[in-house]
Design a protein with these regions (language model features):
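A short loop-to-beta-strand structural motif that recurs across blades of beta-propeller domains
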Residues: 31-35, 75-78, 119-122, 163-166
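Short loop/turn segments that connect beta-strands within beta-propeller blades
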Residues: 1, 37-41, 80-84, 125-129, ...
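Conserved beta-strand positions in repeat-built beta-propeller and related beta-rich domains
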Residues: 23-29, 66-72, 109-116, 156-160
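Surface loop/turn motifs at the tips and blade-to-blade linkers of beta-strand repeat domains
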Residues: 5-9, 47-51, 90-94, 135-139
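Blade-level signature of beta-propeller repeat domains, shared across WD40, Kelch, NHL, RCC1
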Residues: 137-192
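Residue-level detector of Asp-centered blade-edge/turn motifs that repeat once per structural unit
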Residues: 17-20, 60-63, 104-106, 148-151
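Beta-rich catalytic cores
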Residues: 11, 29, 54, 72, ...
Length: 192
């Protein structure tokens, strides 16, 4: 097949395909998210507030909106690609938390803070605008990307540690002795 190159803004990094078929690109060298039409290769840029913003990764919610990590400013953000409205929240560990990887599961946002040791796994509920955090086992190191499994667990890795971790999400009320946030066998983190 043919390969077509298109010029973009600085350092395209994370990329996701939306349910609408459009391609969303995070720019780690600019304060922007791009929306690419795969038929025409036309790019529409959404400007993210603050020139020092750097977007590493993004994911698409069930409503087609974009969730992203603003690594340089220690924030997570939400972009409505229909209206262009952008909103950001401070990550729990502050401006040096360096959010990196992100995934949306059932409209709950999961991401890591790579500026912490050990990394923190963070859960953000957009409806209540509340955060929860868990320390990730130090053997897993800096998480650079996450994947969602068919059973809605998170797979996390850091290439220099030679390990893959699984985060199993527990639904419902905690048992009398809550084990969420504890590390189980084979680098499994239980998160509620």
């Amino acid at each position: 097949g043919d390969i077509t190159h298109i010029d973009t803004r600085a350092r395209p990094y994370g990329i996701k395909v939306g349910a609408n078929g459009l391609i969303y690109v995070a720019f780690n060298g600019d304060n922007a998210i791009g929306e690419v039409n795969p038929e025409t290769l036309e790019i529409h840029y959404f400007t993210i507030p603050h020139e020092d913003s750097r977007i590493r990764r993004l994911d698409v919610g069930s409503d087609g909106s974009i969730w992203y990590v603003n690594s340089a400013r220690g924030k997570i953000g939400h972009l409505n690609p229909v209206t262009g409205e952008v909103r950001e929240w401070d990550s729990p560990s502050g401006p040096n938390s360096h959010p990196y990887a992100i995934a949306v599961i059932d409209d709950i946002v999961w991401y890591n803070e790579s500026g912490q040791r050990p990394d923190a796994l963070v859960r953000f509920d957009p409806d209540s605008e509340t955060f929860q955090s868990w320390a990730i086992p130090s053997g897993i190191g800096i998480i650079r990307h996450v994947w969602v499994t068919q059973d809605k667990a998170l797979l996390i890795h850091q290439s220099s540690s030679n390990r893959i971790g699984r985060v199993r999400l527990i639904q419902g009320e905690p048992p009398p002795e809550d084990t969420s946030g504890q590390i189980g066998a084979q680098n499994e983190l239980l998160a509620r």
